[in-house]
């Protein structure tokens, strides 16, 4: 009960990002030397939803509620993000995949579908590549994967300046200004910045202003060079992923390139475009995103 009260108190006041319904239970799960905040609801075959930067697992609420009618839905906050614990290290995506595998073990889930966005894609690839027998389908949404496909060319994009924005001085610059920093991404990477409303921005700014949160977010990016090494090794050792993959790019962001990237790492890829959206698919066009994901998982 004390844990439940503490978690509810941590929810930023006044946010319109919808809290998960009472049918979902939130708990801290010990895994791989840390603890992840995990929401679980529904019944049926399992599906794991992984978020990325400037979001938390809260982003998936509309999809999670829809899937819970016939799935057991598992929604963690990644290591060092949201309401999960903030360890000093372990931010390679290969290691964070072990976090998620440990969550599945704790919940006695052997196999699951997987839906990922942004940095969640990177953890998702490392999970599927290390445990291919445990991931039955994968929906990967609007972000590249270190070391896979045209990664080196993608790094040249001026929109990705933040991949190298880190260190003590950068953290001091951002401290107390988390809202300003996050607004840059909501505005620059969206098709229409007004679709990320004021309450949503306040909600995530409050979560990223929690102690150590921005430092750990920067650590996610700092791990990219090692992630690229790890992913190339995983692909070389295991070959292309065999499970069905739906690669969704936002119309005003990755677009069809998302599927092209995934075809370098998976052999059964279907491409799709989330229309009228930039990178923030669940904020900008949740109805289309939910419809495309649920249709694919139902096949």
Each predicted region: which residue ranges?
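Catalytic histidine-centered segment of alpha/beta-hydrolase-like enzymes
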Residues: 277-286, 290
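Flexible "cap/lid" subdomain of the alpha/beta-hydrolase fold that forms the substrate-access gate
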Residues: 16-27, 34-36, 46, 81-115, ...
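Sec/Tat signal peptide C-region and signal peptidase I cleavage site
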Residues: 11-15
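Bacterial N-terminal signal peptides
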Residues: 2-10
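Short hydrophobic "strand-cap" motifs at the C-terminus of beta-strands
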Residues: 50, 76, 248-250, 274-277
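A short, glycine- and basic residue-enriched loop/turn
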Residues: 56-57, 122, 278
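Conserved HGGG/HGGXW glycine-rich cap/lid loop of the alpha/beta-hydrolase fold
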Residues: 40-83
């Amino acid at each position: 009960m004390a844990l439940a009260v503490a978690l509810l108190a941590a929810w930023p006041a006044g946010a319109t990002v919808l809290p998960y319904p009472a049918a979902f239970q939130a708990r801290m799960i010990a895994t791989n030397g840390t603890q992840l905040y995990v929401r679980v609801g529904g019944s049926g075959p399992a599906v794991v939803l992984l978020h990325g930067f400037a979001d938390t697992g809260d982003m998936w609420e509309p999809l999670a509620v829809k899937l819970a009618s016939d799935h057991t839905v598992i929604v963690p906050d990644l290591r060092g993000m949201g309401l999960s614990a903030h360890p000093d290290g372990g931010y390679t995506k290969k290691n964070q995949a072990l976090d998620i595998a440990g969550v599945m073990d704790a919940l006695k889930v052997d196999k699951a579908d997987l839906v990922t966005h942004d940095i969640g894609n990177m953890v998702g690839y490392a999970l599927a590549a290390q445990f291919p027998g445990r991931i039955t389908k994968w929906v990967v949404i609007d972000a590249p994967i270190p070391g896979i496909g045209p990664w080196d060319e993608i790094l040249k994009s001026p929109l990705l300046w933040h991949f190298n924005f880190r260190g003590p001085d950068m953290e001091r610059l951002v401290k107390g200004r988390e809202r300003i920093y996050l607004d840059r991404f909501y505005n620059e990477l969206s098709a229409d910045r007004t679709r990320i409303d004021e309450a949503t921005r306040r909600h995530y700014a409050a979560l990223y202003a929690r102690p150590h949160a921005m430092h750990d977010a920067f650590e996610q990016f700092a791990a990219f060079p090692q992630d690229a090494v790890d992913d190339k090794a995983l692909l070389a050792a295991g070959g292309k992923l065999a499970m069905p993959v739906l690669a969704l790019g936002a119309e005003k962001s990755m677009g069809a390139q998302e599927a092209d990237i995934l075809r370098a790492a998976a052999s059964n890829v279907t491409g799709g475009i989330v229309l009228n959206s930039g990178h923030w698919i669940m904020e900008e066009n949740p109805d289309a995103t939910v419809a495309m994901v649920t249709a694919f998982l139902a096949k």
